[in-house]
């Protein structure tokens, strides 16, 4: 077998059996290998940002990495924004990037670039293969690094001649999935701090948000009479009736400061200290008080489940039902005009059981999370890196990883345009995704940001930079042109009708919601 074939077989040995791909000339031997090894599901994406975002969504649902296949430095550069988001979400990805043949790089052909330099800011591990005999070993190392807890981005650069020359044997992947044990003295100190603090809080993220762990944290919180909070943006959170009602720290700086000011001690489990998303004139970057006592109890690489068992024993937690479990509370479907509040009520009423909600609703959806707390049990995925164009690609990956679950993609119209090519992949793969485009025909979030940075009377030129009118986007035409059936709605009644249709039918469907 050649080098590319040895890499594909190694990926399959390591349970990496999906490749989100946008190949070019340098990757043709890898593409050819896909004919021979049909267990690898290769999914074509028309833009590299769709491929990298899809790999992110896949990992969030399956907890195992997919691979990407990108073309040289410019192709990698096109995928950087969603690799950034994936890194912030701690998603594991085997990111394969084609390169010129080793002896061609020195010729400085038009597409020659510093691929390692481009990859490094969004990767935990970067390596260029130097021999076709080594590519399988390098591939096994990439898989191992991508699977380091909680998940890492491993970029493997594949020169053309290492793909076409005779390769070595496929390699087995030797994983090290051991989690770090939280020291007993740190747990003991936390017990004391929780008892002595006047107003403690538990801040959770990552693996602490897994349903079993969050349930145990809620029992601990009940015992010591303190609240649990989480970040505004989380990679994955299972919520809804029968699950813990997670309360997020507000996105808006003033609201976050107000919420957090009362807590003198914050126990951090799998999360990071609260900071503002941006810097603003005369507003704090750190959202807590200067004298807040932080106890970093467990990081994402720690055995959070084991730590919680020890902490529960030392606090004396009974096997009680936490009082923060959400009760089933389906809102009544409203009538009349469409606005953010009525949209949230429709979502709360109609989200099906075990659905996956990918939230890039931006300003329209600020209250959706809370409005769906009593809905049927479902999973919520947020953008952890803030780079827009996240939603539809992540929905692709989630649908591939979890084909038996309905995926709902909540999208702002401006954000969706960054990775609009995602619709074509949804159609080609017949993925079970219902897309809601919230068409406020503007970068509405930036209108608020103008005020936040002190611009009180923006002029015509400034406002034109935030408008998506003249011409207005026609999402129904765009979607149908990509092969996804679509409708436009401007009343709640029509939204309910077509949302029910999209949820009932298998396959992709888009609703343009006029605001």
PLM region descriptions:
Residues 1-319, 350, 433-435:
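N-terminal alpha/beta PP-like core and its mobile active-site loop of ThDP/TPP-dependent enzymes
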Residues 96, 104-111, 366-515:
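Thiamine diphosphate
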Residues 229, 358, 410-411:
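Generic enzyme active-site microenvironment
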Residues 143, 188-191, 216-217, 254-257, ...:
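Generic recognition of flexible, low-complexity loop/linker segments
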Residues 133, 157, 270-365, 445, ...:
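Phosphate/pyrophosphate-binding active-site segments
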Residues 205-209, 332, 412-414:
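Conserved short loop/turn motifs at secondary-structure junctions
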């Amino acid at each position: 077998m050649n080098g590319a074939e040895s890499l594909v077989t190694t990926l399959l040995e390591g349970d990496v059996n999906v490749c989100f791909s946008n190949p070019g000339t340098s990757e043709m031997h890898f593409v050819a290998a896909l004919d021979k090894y049909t267990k690898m599901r290769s999914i074509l994406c028309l833009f590299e940002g769709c491929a990298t975002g899809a790999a992110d969504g896949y990992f969030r649902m399956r907890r195992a990495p997919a691979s990407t296949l990108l073309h040289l430095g410019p192709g990698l550069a096109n995928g950087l924004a969603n690799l950034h988001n994936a890194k912030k979400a701690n998603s594991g990805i085997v990111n394969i990037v084609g390169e010129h043949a080793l002896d061609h790089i020195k010729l400085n052909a038009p597409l020659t670039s510093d691929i390692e330099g481009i990859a490094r800011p969004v990767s935990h591990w970067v390596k260029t293969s130097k021999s076709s005999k080594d590519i399988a070993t390098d591939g096994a190392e990439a898989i191992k690094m991508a699977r380091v807890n909680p998940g890492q981005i491993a970029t493997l650069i594949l020169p053309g001649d290492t793909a076409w020359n005779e390769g070595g044997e496929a390699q087995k992947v030797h994983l090290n999935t051991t989690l770090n044990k939280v020291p007993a003295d740190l747990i003991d100190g936390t017990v004391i701090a929780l008892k002595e603090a006047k107003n403690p809080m538990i801040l959770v993220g990552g693996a602490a948000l897994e349903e079993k762990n969050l349930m145990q944290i809620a029992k601990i919180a009940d015992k010591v009479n303190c609240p649990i909070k989480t970040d505004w943006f989380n990679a994955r959170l299972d919520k809804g009736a029968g699950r813990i009602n997670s309360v997020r720290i507000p996105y808006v700086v003033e609201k976050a400061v107000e919420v957090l000011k009362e807590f003198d001690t914050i126990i951090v489990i799998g999360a990071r200290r609260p900071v503002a998303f941006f810097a603003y004139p005369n507003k704090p970057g750190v959202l807590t008080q200067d004298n807040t006592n932080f106890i970093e109890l467990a990081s994402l690489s720690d055995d959070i489940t084991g730590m919680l068992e020890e902490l529960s024993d030392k606090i004396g937690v009974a096997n009680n039902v936490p009082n923060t479990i959400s009760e089933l509370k389906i809102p009544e479907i409203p009538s009349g005009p469409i606005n953010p509040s009525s949209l949230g009520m429709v979502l709360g009423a109609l989200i099906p059981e075990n659905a996956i909600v990918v939230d890039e609703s931006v300003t329209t959806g600020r209250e959706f999370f809370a409005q769906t707390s009593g809905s049927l049990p479902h999973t919520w995925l947020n953008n952890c890196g803030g780079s827009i164009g996240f939603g539809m690609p992540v929905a692709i990956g989630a649908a591939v990883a979890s084909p038996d679950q309905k995926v709902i993609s909540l999208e702002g119209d401006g954000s969706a345009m960054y990775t609009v090519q995602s619709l074509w992949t949804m159609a080609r793969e017949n993925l079970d995704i219902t897309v809601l485009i919230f068409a406020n025909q503007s970068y509405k979030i930036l209108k608020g940001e103008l005020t936040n940075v002190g611009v009180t009377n923006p002029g015509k030129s400034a406002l034109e930079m935030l408008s998506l009118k003249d011409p207005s986007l026609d999402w129904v035409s765009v979607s149908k042109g990509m092969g996804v059936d679509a409708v436009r709605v401007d009343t709640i009644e029509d939204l309910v009708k077509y949302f029910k249709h999209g949820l009932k039918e298998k396959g992709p469907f888009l609703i343009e919601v006029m605001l």
